[in-house]
């Protein structure tokens, strides 16, 4: 069984136009999370915490996955795409060589909650054309196994006799993103490839990880060892909900400057120059 090697408490942060959020991971020593770069959780019942949204801004060199649990968020980009994310919808955006987009709330009150995950691209694909796709929540596969369920956003894994296949296939890294809900007393074992990075973010309730049953409470990211199955147990009296992220590390240099993630300082400088010259997105 995989074991917990590190646990990180999500930290309060602010991004965009004053949007309050939790930075789950990102920044220092990014190789720990390879091929993932950053995970944010945003969520509030107070409109002033999210109403400013994320006005137009650039990206280059990676992909973003936005997963809405509750609320309404509108995407617009330089390619003319417009999409509205509602409860349980998912957006997968490939920045590639460059995209300029905004993410703005389309509500003035009520609950907004969700996640944004950054997934790295290999050097060979960092300058590929930008792409964007919105997926209604009802189109994301959900697999029910008695006392737990798996919403398969990306990747695939076999649980028992069932092939759990996510909506998105990510050939560069075999990236997996699963939203798992565990009823009290349930146990799930995920047979991951030994070479894969594996991360567990408990966003509601509490679980225990591995044979040692290391506690993983709400707003905690657990980074696991790279061998054996990933075992998650809900020993509590309430439902637990968590994101499981797994993927093959790229093992390439990671150089990040704000919204740009490349392999060298020179490439970052070029991205900044391209953006300032108005040619980032071609």
Question: What label would you give each PLM region?
Answer:
Residues 1-282:
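Jelly-roll (double-stranded beta-helix
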């Amino acid at each position: 069984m995989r074991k917990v090697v590190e646990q990180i408490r999500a930290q309060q942060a602010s991004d965009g136009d004053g949007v309050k959020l939790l930075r789950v991971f990102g920044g220092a020593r990014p190789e720990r999370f390879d091929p993932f770069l950053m995970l944010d959780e945003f969520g509030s019942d107070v409109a002033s915490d999210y109403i400013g949204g994320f006005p137009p801004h650039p990206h280059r060199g990676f992909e973003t996955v936005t997963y809405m649990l509750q609320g309404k968020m509108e995407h617009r980009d330089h390619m003319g795409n417009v999409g509205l994310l509602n409860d349980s919808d998912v957006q997968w955006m490939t920045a590639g060589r460059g995209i300029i987009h905004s993410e703005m709330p389309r509500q003035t009150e009520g609950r907004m909650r969700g996640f944004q995950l950054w997934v790295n691209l290999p050097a060979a694909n960092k300058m590929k054309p930008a792409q964007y796709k919105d997926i209604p929540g009802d189109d994301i596969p959900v697999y029910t196994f008695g006392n737990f369920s798996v919403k398969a956003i990306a990747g695939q894994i076999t649980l028992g006799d069932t092939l759990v296949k996510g909506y998105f296939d990510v050939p560069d890294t075999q990236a997996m993103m699963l939203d798992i809900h565990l009823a009290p007393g349930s146990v799930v074992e995920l047979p991951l490839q030994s070479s894969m990075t594996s991360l567990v973010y408990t966003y509601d309730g509490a679980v225990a990880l591995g044979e040692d049953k290391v506690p993983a409470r709400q707003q905690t990211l657990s980074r696991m060892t790279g061998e054996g199955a990933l075992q998650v147990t809900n020993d509590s009296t309430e439902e637990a909900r968590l994101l499981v992220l797994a993927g093959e590390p790229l093992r390439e240099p990671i150089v990040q400057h704000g919204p740009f993630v490349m392999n060298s300082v020179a490439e970052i400088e070029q991205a900044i120059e391209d953006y300032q010259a108005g040619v980032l997105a071609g």
